[in-house]
Amino acid sequence: MSNKMWGGRFGEGPDAIMEEINVSIDVDRHLYAQDIAASKVHAAMLAAQGIITADDAKNIDKGLDTILSEIRNGTFDFKRALEDIHMNVEGRLGEMIGAAAGRLHTARSRNDQVATDFRLYVRDVIDETDAALAAFQHALLTRALEHSGTVMPGFTHLQTAQPVTFGHHLMAYVEMAARDRGRFADARRRLNESPLGAAALAGTSFPIDRDATAKALGFDRPMANSLDAVSDRDFVLETLSAAAIASIHLSRFAEEIVIWTSPLVGLVRLSDKFTTGSSIMPQKRNPDAAELVRAKTGRVVGALTGLLIVMKGLPLAYQKDMQEDKQGAMEAFGALSLAIRAMTGMVADLVPDEARMKAAAGDGYATATDLADWLVRTLKMPFRDAHHVTGRIVAAASKQGVALHELALQDMQAVEPRITRDALAVLSVEASVKSRTSYGGTAPKNVRSQANAWLKRLEKERKLG
């Protein structure tokens, strides 16, 4: 006969391989706080509904508090034979308070129990991630204000395109992080329904109060369908999707830092705090923090892909496949958390080489569009014609091996006789960025205005809690 808590109908215990593949305590032990919180609420509801006695509920609550302390101080004995966090907690509770512990599982299954625990866990992850992304935004905004007028090259196809400001470039990641936070917030809203009380799949015949347990656990409402409640993992998938997109944003920025810190480019420098050396080459300073942020994206995207594949063919309701929903997700959430903190540190740490940035901003005839715009504004030339004329002027400068602003006026006039000396004023990189005053443009005053507005918004969020 099996000695498992579920073993009443079994004539013998499981094979050792079955034990090994079935156990999940190494992973779901991380749900201990959520499991205990949900059990305390469930016990209180059972007592309020007259399903168990008030004394039993009191003993259960006190015992769960003790177990929570034991886990936190490292004295709790996790037993692999008990499979998971739910049975480990219930088993220890039975050792402490006896038969009353067996009443805790009334009107509840491990199916709705784990669904509740994991929703609470993911909700906590979302809240922590939002706070981390807000701190990342604050670091970006602080540096954007410092460098609202620092000119650097803007790129398309990794080729110099037009001058921008370093502050404007950093502000792009503020906006990306804002969308990331919005996606996490959306996921949280859909997540915030309680599966507790759905039992195995069909609900229960006991007169439970699901509204009360949902409210006590901070959920907006109980889930409306018991089958859906125990078999849904959309909340994990959606949160992993938000995490994957956020990690891709961080990876893009990390890639830029790797490129910018290369001696061949030399636009920024990271201090020793965020670089490492080589075991053989004494001179090396490697941007390993940025490279590892870039690499961790694979773990996050991989976790999303893995869970999508796990869930794709599962009929209703709960299937043991769903036990594989946690490890990859937990690792992904941890990887994202570390990546955000690392990027926040690097943003505060990096030092731009302003002279090199300014010089690079003018490379590749980056102010050619400014000349074309001058032809449109001053000579009323159609833009397509202005584009063609400017292209010929760029070709002339390239043939002479000079920058656009170094080309003689008469050489420009050889292409378009109506060009005047006034056109030369628009060819400096400073004039170029100052002229981009359209909403969302790179003009320093735009950057300062948007950065200050964002800082006020973050401060308002902080005060609202």
From Swiss-Prot:
GO MF term set: argininosuccinate lyase activity
EC numbers for this chain: 4.3.2.1
Localisation per UniProt entry: Cytoplasm
Keyword match Nucleotide-binding: no
Keywords: Amino-acid biosynthesis, Arginine biosynthesis, Cytoplasm, Lyase
Biological processes, Gene Ontology terms: arginine biosynthetic process via ornithine; L-arginine biosynthetic process
Listed SUPFAM superfamilies: L-aspartase-like
Chief site of localization: cytoplasm
Catalysed reaction, written as an equation: 2-(N(omega)-L-arginino)succinate = fumarate + L-arginine
This protein's pathway: Amino-acid biosynthesis; L-arginine biosynthesis; L-arginine from L-ornithine and carbamoyl phosphate: step 3/3
Keyword Kinase found: no
InterPro entries documented for this protein: Arg_succ_lyase_C, Argininosuccinate_lyase, Fumarase/histidase_N, Fumarate_lyase_CS, Fumarate_lyase_fam, Fumarate_lyase_N, L-Aspartase-like
Cellular component terms (Gene Ontology): cytosol
Family note: Belongs to the lyase 1 family. Argininosuccinate lyase subfamily.
Protein name as catalogued: Argininosuccinate lyase
Organism: Nitrobacter hamburgensis (strain DSM 10229 / NCIMB 13809 / X14)
Gene: argH
